[in-house]
Swiss-Prot record:
One of its GO terms (biological process) is thiamine diphosphate biosynthetic process. It catalyses: 5-amino-1-(5-phospho-beta-D-ribosyl)imidazole + S-adenosyl-L-methionine = 4-amino-2-methyl-5-(phosphooxymethyl)pyrimidine + CO + 5'-deoxyadenosine + formate + L-methionine + 3 H(+). Pathway: Cofactor biosynthesis; thiamine diphosphate biosynthesis. Belongs to the ThiC family. Keywords: 4Fe-4S, Iron, Iron-sulfur, Lyase, Metal-binding, S-adenosyl-L-methionine, Thiamine biosynthesis, Zinc. [4Fe-4S] cluster binds at residues 409, 412, 416. This is Phosphomethylpyrimidine synthase. Binds 1 [4Fe-4S] cluster per subunit. The cluster is coordinated with 3 cysteines and an exchangeable S-adenosyl-L-methionine. Zn(2+) binds at residues 269, 333. Catalyzes the synthesis of the hydroxymethylpyrimidine phosphate (HMP-P) moiety of thiamine from aminoimidazole ribotide (AIR) in a radical S-adenosyl-L-methionine (SAM)-dependent reaction.
Length: 427
């Protein structure tokens, strides 16, 4: 039985209890959220070596980190080191987006190495297998696509991105309206090209019940992907994006009816004034399903600094109700991220998530900032470092200060405003 099926029967599972303890809420709160679809409990029934992860309404805003090989760069040891960095830097989940090398072996190694929930995009494996077999991606069969999904379930993958909303109708709306940058989702582009080449509907939409059977078998959460997300501000909130979201809302309801948990993926590149509206639209059309957003990025001109861009957009999106932030690294739009990029991306997204939690009134979020202020007032450097989002960097920066062991840092020295305010005698 799936988590959703048991929640519908009024049963609190062990996974729900573990999530409740971690979140500081009651197990019944988690159960009700799962039943209504506003919370998902993420853990494949074959991936029992990890703690389950709860994502959704009333819970802490979560952060995902992406990793994986490319067709041009295959280094499993580096990817496994990225898994370790994800754990140390405080990510809540990771996704293996590998497209190069022995995809299944890499996925299995990452799942086995991870102590957190693991997601994938199965169409990547299907496409890579087609290329490795010396045939065109366009020659993939529906059976091969579903076989890739089945293998992900067998390997213990906890959630999968599936671009079921990329249909002939939604792609047609993009063609009719026009876009500056076209389709920028890799899975979305593969699917759109496949439909055009084969003059056929997207198999993940046309055979959606087949997908639900696989997801139900392994209790994999479906992350309904935004294959038509905008890749630049000029394309944001256009007809193709909105039509896809309408379809995802309909598919979300069908999945719940089959006791399969669902979250929805969102943009992308969105002008700052449109971010809140995008969240509200998703929550309405998808009946409160958890929203998993990439950024969003409120400007297109910051390659090399897009972790900052994404954190700005992510903070607003999270405050408006987004539940799960996908990190963006400094390498976004430029190259495959290295180890430092992964760390930077996670920290930036965790900052955004914390800002969102303060705005949402999540219990304990504001208290951390109050405690930080107290530590600063007391010149409690160890307390400040331990509480900071990146203790290693905080400690390294402080140790560069000549007065690190005194009451003050090299920024102000004897002119420290806090020191001056505490003095009784004239300076």
């Amino acid at each position: 039985m799936t988590q959703l099926e048991m929640a519908g029967q009024g049963r609190v599972t062990e996974e729900m209890k573990l999530c409740a303890e971690k979140e500081g809420v009651s197990p019944e709160f988690i159960r009700r959220g799962v039943e209504e679809g506003s919370i998902v409990v993420v853990r494949n029934n074959r991936h029992t070596g990890i703690a389950p992860l709860a994502i959704g309404k009333g819970l802490r805003t979560k952060v995902n980190a992406n990793l994986g090989t490319s067709r041009d760069h295959v280094d499993l040891e580096m990817e496994l080191e990225k898994v370790r960095i994800c754990t140390k830097a405080g990510a809540d989940a990771l996704m293996d987006l590998s497209t190069g090398g022995e995809i299944r072996a890499i996925r299995q190694a990452i799942v086995n190495a991870s102590t957190m929930a693991v997601g994938t995009v199965p169409i990547y494996a299907a496409a890579a297998e087609a290329l490795n077999s010396r045939k065109s991606i366009m020659e993939m069969t529906a059976d091969e696509m579903f076989q890739a999904i089945e293998e992900n379930g067998e390997d213990g993958v906890d959630f999968i991105t599936v671009h079921c909303g990329v249909t002939r109708e939604s792609v047609g709306r993009i063609a009719a309206q026009g876009r500056l940058l076209g389709i920028v989702s890799r899975g979305g582009s593969i699917t759109a090209r496949w439909m055009d080449y084969n003059d056929a509907e997207n198999p993940l939409y046309a055979q959606y019940d087949r997908l639900l059977e696989i997801a139900r078998r392994y209790d994999m959460v479906l992350s309904l992907g935004d294959g038509l997300r905008p890749g630049c501000l000029a394309d944001a909130t256009d007809r193709g994006q909105v039509q896809e979201l309408i379809i995802l809302g309909e598919l979300c309801r069908r999945a719940r009816a089959r006791d399969v948990q669902v979250m929805i993926e969102g943009p992308g590149h969105v002008p700052y004034p449109q971010i809140e509206a995008n969240i509200a639209l998703q929550k309405s059309l998808c009946e409160g399903a958890p929203f998993y957003v990439l950024g969003p990025l409120p400007t297109d001109i910051a390659p090399g600094y897009d972790h900052i861009t994404a954190a700005i957009g992510g903070a607003l999106a999270g405050a408006a109700g987004a539940d799960f932030l996908c990190y963006v690294t400094p390498s976004e739009h430029l190259c495959l991220p290295n180890l430092d990029d992964v760390h930077e991306g996670i920290v930036a997204s965790r900052i955004a998530a914390h800002i969102a939690d303060i705005a949402k009134g999540y219990p304990g979020a504001m208290e951390k900032d109050i405690l930080m202020a107290k530590y600063r007032s007391e010149f409690n450097w160890n307390g400040q470092i331990d509480l900071s989002v990146d203790p290693d960097r905080s400690r390294a920066r402080l140790e560069r200060s000549e007065t690190a062991k005194e009451e003050g840092c090299t920024m102000c020295g004897d002119l420290c405003a806090i020191k001056l305010g505490k003095k009784k005698a004239p300076c």
